[in-house]
Amino acid sequence: MSREQAFEMLIKILCKTDSTDDMKLILECILTRSEMEDLIDRIRIYNELLNTSNSQREVASKLGVSITKITRGAANLQDNNIKDFLRKKISY
């Protein structure tokens, strides 16, 4: 199986998952604890950047993450399609 085929399979598995318990189980099976923490931090970063007017340095300090991670997240939000999608999916 190629990486592309495996990626498509992963997407199908995730899309077919309809319960939070099943999704949690899948993520725990395929991600290390460190990878899971990185994903969680990204969600926290996007949520903070989308819902506050805090500077990147303030967000980094508040969340206890590096300014590099904040900058990467802010760069992704420059794409309006990504920004609109994330605003609908993760904003509180």
Swiss-Prot record:
Segments of the chain annotated as binding DNA: 56-78
One example GO MF annotation: sequence-specific DNA binding
Residue stretches spanning the membrane: none
Major place of residence: cytoplasm
The organism's place on the tree of life at top rank: Bacteria
Record's keyword annotation contains Glycoprotein: no
Keyword entries, A-Z: Cytoplasm, DNA-binding, Repressor, Transcription, Transcription regulation
Cell compartments where the protein resides: Cytoplasm
A Gene Ontology cellular-component term: cytoplasm
Subunit structure and binding partners: Homodimer.
NCBIfam families to which the protein is assigned, alphabetical: TrpR
Homology family: Belongs to the TrpR family.
Function noted in UniProt: This protein is an aporepressor. When complexed with L-tryptophan it binds the operator region of the trp operon and prevents the initiation of transcription.
Official protein name in the record: Trp operon repressor homolog
Organism: Xylella fastidiosa (strain Temecula1 / ATCC 700964)
